[in-house]
């Protein structure tokens, strides 16, 4: 069978289903693929079992089960993630294994918001999922219109509580199972949901359009030409003649100009996100730059020591710690290309963290690193990974 050509003319977004166990996330995922396929003949209609039997993947040593499906509307192409278990969501969202530009929060109209509904909204807030659209599922099981309105209000309040715009979030009422069974009235609700997703979740900015940043992996001197920093461009573009800042691991940021860009020993005019390059830097001595720093467009990212982070602590089975840790625990925090020691403070009322838990903690590093909300890191101890985290807010 010939492979279908990937249509680049459509914009692309990554989304996922979130919500409490058994509220219908996987059924909804199956319904979206099925209903859209039926209409356009594009994509693949997936059955519940095909999605539910997601294989385990290992992302940075963490075992996660995730189902990846794709489908398209008239306006956009979507990559959609759905996870079988609550723990898989926690790991997925914290490690960034599944980047989400937006999420569909599935809430059973028959049950209303439940503990994991709240936890997934909090996680979305902390790991930087920017937009949420709500699907009230199982509405065929609720005869009372007032009850539906009550559940909708509860969900909106919950979203507002975690700083999402609860009053403006689109809420679609439907039944994933009925849509999957081909009930026209409920198929229409799937189209309504996807129209809301198309409209409400903006097309993400491409990595190449963001401000330039490159983590420094290695540094060497070329006699007579100067100092070269090598690494993979994480975002944006850099051109010969651009001014950049060297950030992190030192008191002052240093500004310099890129006088040459090389890739595979060839000289380039510019490099962009994804390229592995060497950047020749004017007037920078070998001692003034080191692995673990970043090169960035001036003023776009700043060095910090203290931040809040959402962290998943690896279980013993995943090769993590066998024992809990407490406040003042001092492991290494691995940011991009280097380890920095940091001190952990647990939230008030939390005495210790067990392997397999997730928690929001405060971290203070011993030296500054270029970080921002959404920067991901690993926690390491003697070279092995014991946790995975994402910066949820900068303190100083």
Swiss-Prot record:
Residues 61-65 are annotated as: G2. The keyword Metal-binding applies. Residues 82-85 are annotated as: G3. It is an enzyme of class 3 (hydrolase). Residues 175-177 are annotated as: G5. Keywords: Cytoplasm, Elongation factor, GTP-binding, Hydrolase, Magnesium, Metal-binding, Nucleotide-binding, Protein biosynthesis. Its main location: cytoplasm. It is found in: Cytoplasm. Residues 19-26 are annotated as: G1. The keyword Cytoplasm applies. SUPFAM superfamilies: EF-Tu/eEF-1alpha/eIF2-gamma C-terminal domain, P-loop containing nucleoside triphosphate hydrolases, Translation proteins. Mg(2+) binds at residue 26. Residues 10-205 form the tr-type G domain. Residues 137-140 are annotated as: G4. GTP binds at residues 19-26, 82-86, 137-140. GO terms for molecular function: GTP binding; GTPase activity; translation elongation factor activity. It catalyses: GTP + H2O = GDP + phosphate + H(+). It holds the Pfam family GTP_EFTU_D3. Its EC number is 3.6.5.3. GO terms for cellular component: cytosol. PROSITE patterns: G_TR_1 (PS00301), G_TR_2 (PS51722). Belongs to the TRAFAC class translation factor GTPase superfamily. Classic translation factor GTPase family. EF-Tu/EF-1A subfamily. PANTHER family: ELONGATION FACTOR TU, MITOCHONDRIAL, ELONGATION FACTOR TU-RELATED. GTP hydrolase that promotes the GTP-dependent binding of aminoacyl-tRNA to the A-site of ribosomes during protein biosynthesis. Monomer. This is Elongation factor Tu. It comes from Bacillus licheniformis (strain ATCC 14580 / DSM 13 / JCM 2505 / CCUG 7422 / NBRC 12200 / NCIMB 9375 / NCTC 10341 / NRRL NRS-1264 / Gibson 46). The gene is tuf.
